[in-house]
């Protein structure tokens, strides 16, 4: 599923991401835009053989199991394919685990590059939340 910006913001809010660990909703919407272009089915292969999955591009080396990444830790206890459904709840649950891990949203390269230190409130502007 490809979400519209405000539709995604509403879903993320419903699942408790607004101000989760101090990160406002705009941070999450911005991250999703630059990680996956709001596409739940996005996948990207990394040079180390791992793959990133779903709307927040969650990595198979650490967080999910795709059955082909050697030495996966699967810290979210989830199959990577479950991160690619139209319902973003599994991705949100795992993202909460990731962002609680000590490095916050710095775990997402696209967030560091495009969202960190910017006015992320623009990402939820005009959304009826």
Curated annotation (Swiss-Prot):
Residue pairs linked by disulfide bridges in the UniProt entry: 6-127, 30-115, 64-80, 76-94
EC numbers: 3.2.1.17
Active-site residues, record numbering mapped to chain: 35, 52
SMART domains, per database record: LYZ1
Location of the protein in the cell: Secreted
Pfam family for this entry, one: Lys
Keyword field: Antimicrobial, Bacteriolytic enzyme, Disulfide bond, Glycosidase, Hydrolase, Secreted
InterPro entries associated with the record: Glyco_hydro_22 (IPR001916), Glyco_hydro_22_CS (IPR019799), Glyco_hydro_22_lys (IPR000974), Lysozyme-like_dom_sf (IPR023346)
Domain (C-type lysozyme): residue spans on this chain: 1-129
Role according to the record: Lysozymes have primarily a bacteriolytic function; those in tissues and body fluids are associated with the monocyte-macrophage system and enhance the activity of immunoagents.
Name listed for the protein in its UniProt record: Lysozyme C
Organism, as annotated: Ortalis vetula
């Amino acid at each position: 599923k490809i979400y519209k910006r405000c539709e995604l913001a509403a879903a993320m809010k419903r699942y408790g991401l607004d101000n989760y660990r101090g990160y406002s909703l705009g941070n999450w919407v911005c991250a999703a835009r630059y990680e996956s272009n709001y596409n739940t089915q996005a996948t990207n292969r990394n040079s180390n053989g791992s793959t990133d999955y779903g709307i927040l591009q969650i990595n198979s080396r650490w967080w999910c199991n795709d059955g082909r990444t050697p030495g996966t830790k699967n810290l979210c206890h989830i199959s990577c394919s479950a991160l690619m459904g139209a319902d973003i709840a599994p991705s949100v649950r795992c993202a909460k685990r990731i962002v609680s891990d000590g490095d916050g949203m710095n775990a997402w390269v696209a967030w560091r590059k495009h969202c960190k230190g910017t006015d992320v409130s623009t990402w939820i502007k005009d959304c009826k939340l």
